[in-house]
Amino acid sequence: MDRPLYPFTAVVGQERAKQALLCLAVEPRIGGVLLCGEKGTAKSTLVRALGGLEGVRLLELPVSATEDMLLGGVELEAAVRTGCRTFQPGLLARADGAVLYADEVNLLPSALTAALLDTLETGVCRVERDGISHTCPARFALVGTMNPEEGTLRPQLLDRFGLYVAVTGER
């Protein structure tokens, strides 16, 4: 990640959220982590700080992502330059072996949620579009954050998280 990281250990409180994220860092196969809480409870800060820990590679899935960004597609520059269609990997393929962070996961569009669920289930990203058919490994740990005031999470996506932590404001 290219943004400055707030150190994981510098976040005061939120011990259950920290413990869940550290469990994921140690054993990515636990099934992912969902942090749910109101705005300003350090959910995103903690997840981004996880990427600063040794051995953890973190990629972010923006809520504004498109299918091309998520799955990949034709590398337009190469297609224009050479006339050949070459595959440009999307975020899911690049997340292989990493932690994929979806902020406001409950706000992801249905098409992205379906692609994410399929890839989580199979561990493979399949792309068939624009005259390209491509398959690549995509085994990653999913971390999501959400504010319940902004909507619920689809049940089929909720089932993909092994750990759920309700994050509250420290008093």
What does each of the following model-derived ranges do?
Residues 3-39:
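Pre-Walker A (pre-P-loop) alpha-helix and adjacent loop at the N terminus of AAA/AAA+ ATPase modules
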Residues 11, 30, 34-38, 80-91, ...:
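Conserved Walker
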Residues 22-25, 79-100:
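Conserved alpha-helical scaffold flanking the Walker A/P-loop in AAA+ ATPase domains
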Residues 25-63:
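Walker A/P-loop
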Residues 30-31, 54-56, 96-97, 122-124, ...:
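Short glycine-/polar-rich loops that comprise or flank the Walker A/P-loop
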Residues 46, 66-69, 93-120, 152-160:
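Conserved AAA+/SF3 P-loop NTPase catalytic/coupling segment centered on the Walker-B
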Residues 53-79:
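AAA+/P-loop NTPase substrate/partner-engagement loops
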Residues 59-62, 164-171:
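Conserved AAA+ ATPase "SRH/arginine-finger" region at the nucleotide-binding site
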